[in-house]
C-alpha cells in the first residue's frame, strides 16, 4: 500500500554535500554520436554553492560552471560547446545532480521505497529512494521520464557510478569515480 508522508527536512541528495572533499570522476559524454572523455570534478564551495569542471585528460577545460543558490554562472566553456541549448541542458542536468535540498511537493512511500516529488528550475523531478538510499532522480514532462540520473556503487554517501541518460535526445553522461 502506498502512503503519503510529510516532506523530509534533511538532505535529499547527500552525494556532493561534503565541502572538504573533491569529487573526481572519469567522464564519458556521448552526444549525437560524438564521444568526449575526460575528468569531471565537483567541489562544494559553500552552503548552497558548487563548482563543476569538465576537462580533457590533457587538462584543457571543456566547461567550468558555478551554481550558487538560484544563480548559474558559466565561468568558462570551449567555443565549440558554447551553444545556448547545450548550456541549458547541462544547467538542468547538473543542478539536479548537486542540489541537496530541493523544494519538496509530495512524498510517497511503500515498504522500504520512497518517492519524493520536487521542482527544480521549474521542472518536475522525482527522487527515488531504496532503503533510505537515493538511487535515481528522474525529470518528467507530461508524465513521461525525459532525463534519468542513476546512482550506483553507493558507499558512505558517495556514488561511485553516475549515469545521466536523456530519453528525448541522444545524450548520455557516464561518470565513474576515481580512487
Residue ranges and their predicted role:
Residues 1-38:
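N-terminal leader/targeting segments and the immediate start of mature chains
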Residues 39-42, 62-64, 126, 148-150:
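Short, surface-exposed charged micro-motifs
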Residues 27-31, 36-60, 67:
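N-terminal beta-strand/beta-hairpin edge segment
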Residues 47-54, 71-78, 132-139, 157-163:
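Short, well-ordered strand-loop elements centered on a beta-strand within folded domains, enriched
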Residues 34-36, 57, 61-63, 142-146, ...:
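Amphipathic hydrophobic-ligand
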Residues 16-20, 43-48, 67, 155-157:
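Edge/loop elements at the starts and ends of beta-strands within beta-rich repeat scaffolds
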Residues 51-98:
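An acidic-aromatic
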Residues 26-28, 85-179:
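Mature, soluble, non-transmembrane domains
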Amino acid at each position: 500500500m502506498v502512503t503519503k508522508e510529510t516532506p523530509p527536512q534533511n538532505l535529499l541528495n547527500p552525494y556532493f554535500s561534503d565541502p572538504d572533499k573533491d569529487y573526481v570522476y572519469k567522464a564519458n559524454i556521448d552526444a549525437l554520436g560524438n564521444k568526449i572523455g575526460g575528468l569531471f570534478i565537483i567541489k562544494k564551495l559553500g552552503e548552497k554553492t558548487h563548482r563543476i569542471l569538465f576537462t580533457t585528460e590533457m587538462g584543457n577545460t571543456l566547461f567550468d560552471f558555478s551554481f550558487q543558490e538560484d544563480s548559474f554562472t558559466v565561468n568558462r566553456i570551449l567555443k565549440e560547446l558554447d551553444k545556448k541549448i547545450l548550456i541549458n541542458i547541462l544547467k538542468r542536468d547538473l543542478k539536479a545532480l548537486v542540489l541537496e535540498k530541493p523544494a519538496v511537493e509530495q512524498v510517497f512511500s511503500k515498504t522500504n521505497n520512497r518517492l519524493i516529488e520536487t521542482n527544480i528550475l521549474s521542472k518536475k523531478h522525482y527522487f527515488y529512494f531504496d532503503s533510505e538510499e537515493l538511487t535515481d532522480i528522474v525529470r518528467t514532462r507530461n508524465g513521461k521520464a525525459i532525463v534519468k540520473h542513476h546512482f550506483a556503487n553507493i558507499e558512505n554517501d558517495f556514488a561511485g557510478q553516475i549515469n545521466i541518460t536523456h530519453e528525448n535526445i541522444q545524450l548520455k553522461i557516464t561518470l565513474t569515480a576515481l580512487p
